[in-house]
From Swiss-Prot:
Other information: In its host, LCK protein is inactivated, preventing T-cell transformation activity.
Source lineage: Viruses, Duplodnaviria, Heunggongvirae, Peploviricota, Herviviricetes
Residue segments, region CSKH/LBD2: 104-113
GO cellular component: host cell plasma membrane; membrane
Lipid bilayer topology: Single-pass membrane protein
Region feature SH3B/LBD1, mapped onto this chain: 132-141
Keyword Transmembrane helix: yes
Name under which the protein is recorded: Tyrosine-protein kinase-interacting protein
Cytoplasmic side: 1-186
Span list, region Disordered: 1-59, 117-151
Compositionally biased spans, kind Basic and acidic residues: 15-26
Species name: Saimiriine herpesvirus 2 (strain 484-77) (SaHV-2)
Function: Plays a critical role in virus induced T-cell transformation. Binds to T-cell-specific tyrosine kinase LCK SH2 and SH3 domains, thereby activating its kinase activity. Once phosphorylated by host LCK, forms a complex with at least STAT 1 and 3, resulting on the phosphorylation of STAT3 and presumably STAT1, and their migration into the nucleus to induce transcription of target genes. Stimulates host ILF3/NF-AT-90 activity. Association with host NXF1/TAP transduces the signal up-regulating surface expression of adhesion molecules as well as activating NF-kappa-B activity.
Extracellular side: 208-214
Amino acid sequence: MENQREEIELTEIPETEKKRTAEEKLLSCSAETAEEKVSLCSEETTDTSSSSSSEQTPAPIEVNVNIQTSTYLPQNAATNLNSLYTSFEDARAQGKGLVRHNSDDLKSFLEKYPPDYRKPKRDLSESWDPGMPKPTLPPRPANLGASQASTVRRHVREQNFKQLRERKANEGKIVKDLKRLEYKVNIILCLVVVILAIILLLTGLSILFIRIKS
């Protein structure tokens, strides 16, 4: 029995080896065919792309441009962006006609402007071009006179606004109370005058009645 089992196992080994070799051959053939297809497709795409690029790409145009003066900038130009940037203060002064911007001026904001640059007194002799005309002063306002001048009235600070409002409210209340008192006093005086007139009439009539009887 043992000899028969060994013979069966020996007969099975060459069959499995044949199957493995057949599978390996199939895999190698499929890989070779796939590589050939990919190479053919890549060659076709390269041919079409080269032909289309040769048809579409125009000849390069040489342009001589001064980067600092012109607004046109070619591609892939090595330019310093700070030379093309104007700060807000420079643009505002340039719009007012005070300063002519210089693109070579690459100083920082703190170096260019001192801490007290917002004050009205500022020396513009360094940045002023002698060829530029001086700005004309605005026309003087008309003389409004003493009655219409803004400095005639007394200026009050904001801290005293509450006190002034309270004073005005108290004054209004006092005026109303005085008016009420005047009205009451007038009514009382009128009543007194009417009573005195009635008394005088009664006394006169009584005197006349007594004389008539006598």
